[in-house]
Amino acid sequence: MSRLKKLYTEEIRKTLQDKFQYENVMQIPVLKKIVISMGLAEAAKDKNLFQAHLEELAVISSQKPLVTRARNSIAGFKLREGQGIGAKVTLRGIRMYDFMDRFCNIVSPRIRDFRGFSCKGDGRGCYSFGLDDQQIFPEVDLDRVKRSQGMNITWVTTAQTDAECLTLLECMGLRFKKAQ
């Protein structure tokens, strides 16, 4: 069992139960999945660069990424139907908890001028943010990076409100800016 999963079952559930006064243990929020996505439209013109970014995403997530393709052609953007324009990975289970543990303890402290993530969720129990650079992940070989590429990370929970979601993620180790 992952360290973070064990922490959730032994401590975090009790903390959330006490704070939000749930009547049933099934109401306690759970982290369902983590979605990591990269928009690679500019890299789509260069197959080697596109493939390099796919490999970096695979190394970061420990899972093969799914290539997202254009639904229809747009001449103004030089985009053809079926052309690869991005990649995404959905993490669940043990890989999800391992990624969350690595992200909170190793990656987020490596972000330049990091003072915490914004305290704004989507209102439905999910939390998303963007990273400007993939080079903050220790798994990425800096000598092989051809171009800096950002990514979006979405934490999907079963929480009903932003307060529940942010409390769950904060208990799991994600750092947020303090309210002023």
Curated annotation (Swiss-Prot):
Gene Ontology cellular component terms for the protein in this record: cytosolic large ribosomal subunit
Name listed for the protein in its UniProt record: Large ribosomal subunit protein uL5
Record's subunit section: Part of the 50S ribosomal subunit; part of the 5S rRNA/L5/L18/L25 subcomplex. Contacts the 5S rRNA and the P site tRNA. Forms a bridge to the 30S subunit in the 70S ribosome.
Biological process, per Gene Ontology: translation
Pfam family, one: Ribosomal_L5
Single GO MF annotation: structural constituent of ribosome
UniProt xrefs under PANTHER family: 60S RIBOSOMAL PROTEIN L11-RELATED (PTHR11994)
Family the entry assigns: Belongs to the universal ribosomal protein uL5 family.
Biological role stated in the UniProt entry: This is one of the proteins that bind and probably mediate the attachment of the 5S RNA into the large ribosomal subunit, where it forms part of the central protuberance. In the 70S ribosome it contacts protein S13 of the 30S subunit (bridge B1b), connecting the 2 subunits; this bridge is implicated in subunit movement. Contacts the P site tRNA; the 5S rRNA and some of its associated proteins might help stabilize positioning of ribosome-bound tRNAs.
Gene name per UniProt: rplE
Keywords: Ribonucleoprotein, Ribosomal protein, RNA-binding, rRNA-binding, tRNA-binding
